[in-house]
């Protein structure tokens, strides 16, 4: 996955630690279907200006949702909800972040993990995910609304598509079946 590379720690490096989090996944009937493990960075140990700069990640405001829902009803738009799996892991890490080797992976050396990709728990994970999503939507000809930084619109001839974003949950509103199918394939 190339999430990190092992390196000798640079002098005066501040290391963050990590923790394994174990999750049970259940089906609709309450039957255990799988076990899941996630490595989480302890981002509370990060220092501003040292291993992160920006942490702000916008969310859609309720007034924008209400306005889009009113448009949807008036114009008979279709609606679909989408959840982006592993969204925070998709951001691009810009800062140098060093982390102790995870429990169970320690190779007995003094080497540390220089993170290449995001991990859950990093202070900048949400912000970087939002930057990546914004860039992707703009590449698909969506325009970000000035009045709502988590609302995007695209007009395609007679069709209109609106996407609203709440962290890693998207609501897709479209005026036609073909546009809905086209947007489903873009994720």
Where are the language model's segments positioned?
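Long, low-complexity, charge-biased intrinsically disordered regions
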Residues: 1-187
């Amino acid at each position: 996955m190339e999430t990190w590379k092992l390196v000798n720690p640079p002098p005066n490096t501040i290391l963050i630690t990590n923790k394994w989090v174990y999750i049970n996944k259940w089906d609709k009937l309450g039957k255990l279907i799988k076990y899941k493990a996630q490595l989480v960075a302890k981002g509370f140990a990060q220092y501003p200006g040292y291993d992160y700069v920006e942490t702000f990640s916008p969310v859609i405001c309720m007034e924008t949702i209400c306005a889009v829902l009113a448009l949807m009803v008036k114009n008979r738009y279709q609606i679909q909800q989408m959840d982006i799996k592993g969204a925070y892991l998709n951001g691009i890490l810009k800062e140098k972040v060093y982390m102790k080797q995870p429990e169970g992976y320690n190779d007995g050396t003094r080497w540390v993990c220089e993170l290449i990709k995001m991990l859950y728990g990093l202070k900048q994970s949400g912000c970087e995910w939002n930057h990546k999503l914004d860039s992707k939507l703009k590449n698909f000809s969506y325009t970000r609304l000035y009045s709502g930084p988590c609302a995007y619109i695209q007009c395609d001839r007679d069709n209109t598509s609106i996407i609203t974003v709440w962290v890693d949950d998207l609501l897709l509103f479209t005026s036609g079946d073909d546009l809905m199918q086209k947007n489903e394939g873009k994720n």
